[in-house]
Amino acid sequence: MREYLFPLRKITNKFQSINSKKDLQNFVKERAAHVTQTTLYGYLKTRIGTRYAIMIEDEKFAESINIAKWNIYVSAISDLTFYVFSYLIDKKNLKQNDAEEIFLNIINEEYKNGLSKNIHENAKNEFISKAKNINWHEYYQTNPFKESGLALY
């Protein structure tokens, strides 16, 4: 009963340090989901206004929102993964770069949750291609969230 009324552990877990690869993966996944939800749904509420609830119930519109949601989400996961590993490599001297593994784990999980095969494959191929050419020591300083920002358009 106490945990229900005062979910302290649930709240404080959000502020604990990242101590494992799994913690890092959860951080990237949760932050990317948060960014996607606040930007996409905030934008829609602003543009649609009072008709927001009605539009969400429209089947075609809901399908379009779902496609946009997945595109923005995988882009946010990609940008955040690159940012995190770039920062850790440059500032914290991280030696083992598991960016690709973390990214693929997340999108493979999301594929099971409804991410379309097309978006999954495109995101995977783009990430792998970009990872080959990235300057890991500078990426976090050079407009690291450009792609996910552009995914809104």
Can you say where each PLM-predicted feature lies in the sequence?
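N-terminal interaction modules that seed assembly of large macromolecular complexes
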Residues: 42-94
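Eukaryote-specific, cytoplasm-facing alpha-helical/coiled-coil scaffolding segments in long proteins
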Residues: 63-68, 101-116
